[in-house]
Amino acid sequence: MADFNQILTPGDVDAGIINVVNEIPEGSCHKIEWNRKVAAFQLDRVEPAIFAKPTNYGFIPQTLDEDGDELDVLLITRQPLATGVFLEAKVIGVMKFVDDGEVDDKIVCVPADDRDTGNAYNSLADLPANLIKQIEFHFNNYKALKKPGSTKVTHWGDVEEAKEVIRESIKRWNER
């Protein structure tokens, strides 16, 4: 398997278009992660079925979040995407998140060319309010059976805040 951090750039952040590699399909309870050391996907653990991912979950290549992993992405699509699929995506916001005391932000995006929705999603405000609630509930509670209170969505940010999070993550990658 090719190393996504070698073959893909983060994308055109200023234009709000990023490259995304999908790790976990929407609806999956398998915690699949990109293992940078071996350049392959790895099953980290199986979550309880009630904590299946509410969206596709992936990362932006050549970025590092404050937790030391590639910057996470919540990718909104009508149907689940397979592990290993990569695409250009449009940034629509950021979910500011703390996991076990570490910043672990999630960039929220949609496919850059989404003819199904007519490219209707340009900001978090364009998403169904109930989807935002479901995502927030998931991330506030998905570790509750093992470590109650260890995760917290602190707030939702707009496209510009998301771009700044991405820029900082690119800087961390380049300085590693």
From Swiss-Prot:
The protein's Enzyme Commission number: 3.6.1.1
GO MF annotations, alphabetized: inorganic diphosphate phosphatase activity; magnesium ion binding
Any Gene Ontology CC annotation: cytosol
Classification via InterPro entries: Pyrophosphatase, Pyrophosphatase_sf
Location in the cell: Cytoplasm
Reaction catalysis annotation: diphosphate + H2O = 2 phosphate + H(+)
Signal peptide as annotated in the record: none
Cofactor(s) demanded: Mg(2+)
Binding annotation for substrate: 31, 45, 57, 142
Pfam families given in the database record: Pyrophosphatase
Positions bound to Mg(2+) 1: 67, 72, 104
Residues binding Mg(2+) 2, per UniProt: 72
Keywords: Cytoplasm, Hydrolase, Magnesium, Metal-binding
Annotated GO biological process: phosphate-containing compound metabolic process
Subunit field text: Homohexamer.
Homology family: Belongs to the PPase family.
Function recorded in the entry: Catalyzes the hydrolysis of inorganic pyrophosphate (PPi) forming two phosphate ions.
Protein name: Inorganic pyrophosphatase
Protein's organism: Haemophilus influenzae (strain ATCC 51907 / DSM 11121 / KW20 / Rd)
